Amino acid sequence: MVDPVDAIGKARAAVTQRAELPGMSLMEHLDELRRRIVHSAIYLGLGFAAAWVFHDRLVDFIQAPLKNDGKSLNMIHPMDGMNLAINVSLVGGAILASPFILYQVWLFIAPGLYQKERRFVVPFMAATVGLFLTGAYFGYFWVLPAAVHIMLDVFGKKFTAVISIEEYTSFFLSIILGLGISFEMPILIFFLALFGIVSPRFLWKNFRYAILLIFLVAGIICPMADAVSMCIYAIPLLALYLVGIGVAWWVHPSRRKAKAAKAAKEAAH
């Protein structure tokens, strides 16, 4: 297992090393942060406005798995319909605005990065958005239809389904956003390895613990309690963990130091 004290020390050293780079004062950092937050909020507002134009189609989109199973949503409270339109527009707007918001994050952190680390910006943004959309796609076309079928047609076949808009929206977003965020695992491993907090050897050595943790996470975000559904959640996450090990091997400081030492040795000869 990882030593928490050692991990914290490595993280602190990485932050301290960047703090020593020539840059802005604290007040300048705060002012820059304020600007980036304002710009991100503007992009989010524009994304919301664009999504609102198509909110009827977005509502049909999230209802499709239910309609394909012969079910429909029920309005329990007078505000349910409007709340659904607002929620789907917010989520859709956030997805539309995410590349621009990530760019604002990049503009804020770029002054504190070395030139060799800045080359990761385009792959980072593309991978972050791509992995989230892949997780959301997997959730919508695979997990959600299976969940609807199991809960309504298998366990609920003896009952009359009265599905409220609020409960279904929460259920839908927990699957789509939960898997979208979970699919960002290689990005998290990338940064942990880049700063030397974890190594590919550590990740591989503790693979069995990762399996337990991934199945625990799958059990938390999975709406079904059966083992098959948990495996549907967990197997892609295990594959992404293995991808993360490859990413860690690629960016870990020990590999970069070894390459630099080899280059210096060859230059000496």
What is the meaning of each model-derived region?
Residues 1-269:
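Membrane topogenic/interface segments and analogous intrinsically disordered interaction regions
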